[in-house]
Structure formats: C-alpha cells, structure tokens
C-alpha cells in the first residue's frame, strides 16, 4: 500500500514538473516569435554602444568632463558604453 502511494505521488510530482517546464518553453517560444530577431537586437546594441562612446569622446576632447549621454529604453551609459539597467 505504501509503495503504491509513493509511486502515485512520485508520478504526480513528475507530471507537475514536466507541465511547468513545458509551459515555460512555450512562453519563451512565444516571446521569441513576437520580439525582434537576434541579429536586429545585436545591431541595436552596437548602435547604442557606438553612440554613447562617441558622445563621451567628443566631450572629453573639448576639455570638459565627460557628461554621459542618456541612453533610452532601459539602458544606462557606464564607462563609455550603454549597458542594460
């Protein structure tokens, strides 16, 4: 009787874990379909990095303290680079 109960509980736990993992994979796949492709995201990241570093270099050449350009959309300028906040 105890063995049967343990087997049933084990199967139920495995089923719950499997269902949770399947839901997470499905959510990830939907996010990937809705979002931009990785190549476009990489291009956006490179543009942000370039804009921020160029802005700081221009200000340094003018004998002024580097006041970092504000990066938009959840990005922050640190060490002449835009980084995600």
UniProtKB/Swiss-Prot annotation:
Residues 1-22 form the signal peptide. GO terms for cellular component: extracellular region; host cell postsynaptic membrane. One of its GO terms (molecular function) is toxin activity. Disulfide bonds join 52-66, 56-77, 71-82. The keyword Secreted applies. It is found in: Secreted. The keyword Signal applies. Keywords: Disulfide bond, Neurotoxin, Postsynaptic neurotoxin, Secreted, Signal, Toxin. Residues 23-48 form a propeptide. Expressed by the venom gland. InterPro entries: Hwtx-2-like. It comes from the Eukaryota. Monomer. Neurotoxin active on both insects and mammals. Belongs to the neurotoxin 12 (Hwtx-2) family. 02 (Hwtx-2) subfamily. This is U4-theraphotoxin-Hhn1a. It comes from Cyriopagopus hainanus.
């Amino acid at each position: 009787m105890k063995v049967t109960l343990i087997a049933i509980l084990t199967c139920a736990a495995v089923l719950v874990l499997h269902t949770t993992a399947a839901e997470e994979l499905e959510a990830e796949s939907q996010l990937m379909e809705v979002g931009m492709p990785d190549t476009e995201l990489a291009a956006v990241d490179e543009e942000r990095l370039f804009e921020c570093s160029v802005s700081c270099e221009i200000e340094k050449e003018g004998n002024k303290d580097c006041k970092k350009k504000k990066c938009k959309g959840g990005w922050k300028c640190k060490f002449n680079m835009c980084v995600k906040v």
